[in-house]
């Protein structure tokens, strides 16, 4: 259902407010560069510091601007099941193709709680769900056997796996079947992830290098592993540099270097990346031939 290079879109703010005009142009550029789907209001989009109304507005704008050219997977996660459902219903009404639903964070449910959370969402909304597993942020990890139990639900169609454990791809194939959509959530591990059966990456780096990331994904899908490895070598310093300080600070800094009039604006508690981080981004952009 979903595959290829899928940017987890940044949300541009200017003087603290959503810069809708720039965002619409950014969506067009991403599609023109070969991104195969778009994810607004994920972690990289600073969804944690948006109001519910603002969050839903950004999702609507993304869907409007995409105009059906590529699927839109709306960020809909919350540690409050009722709020996650509210986001899903709003995204479905706006025309989203799927919801990206992060595991509930901070309150740390057990595996039974995770099943109950996702069953409540699927019982009350028919929008397809991609489960988002990122234990480093949520302090909760969905186990392959738990995911397998959820994979039997028609509207749970895939996972964004940012567990950092590439062997999970094989374990999840065993529990969920080979047709369950597995998307890497780590740019730096995407090559191994794809080789083991993944079908794409929900990417931070694609914000800055959408064309190269799309080319990398196409090479993997075509089985051109030598070409994919060459692109991995080209992009790897950028994958690392974009996490050399708290994300999405480095990726927004990179965009001020590479994308016209991109605003240098983050919402607290996020702050601008350090001088060392900015230098790492500069060097990585040069290595990738972007700036």
Curated annotation (Swiss-Prot):
Residues the record marks as active site: 132 (proton donor/acceptor), 160 (schiff-base intermediate with substrate)
Biochemical pathway: Amino-acid biosynthesis; L-lysine biosynthesis via DAP pathway; (S)-tetrahydrodipicolinate from L-aspartate: step 3/4
GO annotations of cellular component type: cytosol
Subcellular location as annotated: Cytoplasm
Gene Ontology BP terms: diaminopimelate biosynthetic process; lysine biosynthetic process via diaminopimelate
Subunit structure: Homotetramer; dimer of dimers.
Protein name as annotated: 4-hydroxy-tetrahydrodipicolinate synthase
């Amino acid at each position: 259902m979903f595959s290829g290079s899928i940017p987890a879109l940044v949300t541009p703010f200017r003087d603290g407010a959503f810069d809708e005009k720039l965002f619409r142009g950014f969506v067009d550029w991403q599609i023109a560069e070969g991104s195969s789907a778009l994810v607004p209001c994920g972690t990289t989009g600073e969804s944690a510091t948006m109001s519910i109304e603002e969050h839903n507005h950004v999702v609507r704008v993304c869907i409007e601007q995409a105009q059906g050219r590529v699927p839109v997977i709306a960020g809909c996660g919350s540690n409050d099941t009722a709020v996650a459902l509210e986001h899903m219903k709003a995204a479905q009404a706006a025309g989203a193709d799927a919801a990206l639903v992060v595991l509930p964070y901070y309150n740390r449910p057990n595996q039974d709680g995770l099943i109950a959370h996702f069953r409540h969402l699927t019982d009350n909304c028919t929008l397809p769900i991609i489960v988002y597993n990122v234990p480093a942020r949520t302090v909760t990890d969905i186990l392959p056997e738990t995911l397998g139990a959820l994979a039997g639900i028609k509207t749970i169609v895939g996972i964004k796996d940012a567990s950092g454990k590439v062997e999970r791809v094989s374990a999840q194939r065993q529990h969920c079947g080979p047709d369950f959509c597995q998307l890497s959530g780590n740019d730096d591990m995407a090559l191994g992830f794809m080789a083991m059966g993944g079908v794409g990456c929900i990417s931070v780096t694609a914000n800055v290098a959408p064309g190269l990331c799309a080319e990398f994904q196409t090479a993997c899908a075509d089985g051109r592993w030598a070409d994919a490895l060459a692109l991995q070598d080209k992009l790897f310093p950028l994958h690392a540099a974009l996490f050399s300080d708290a994300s999405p600070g480095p990726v927004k800094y990179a965009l001020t270097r590479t994308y016209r009039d991109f605003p240098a604006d983050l919402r607290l508690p996020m702050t601008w990346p350090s001088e060392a981080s900015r230098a790492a981004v500069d060097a990585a952009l040069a290595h990738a031939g972007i700036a």
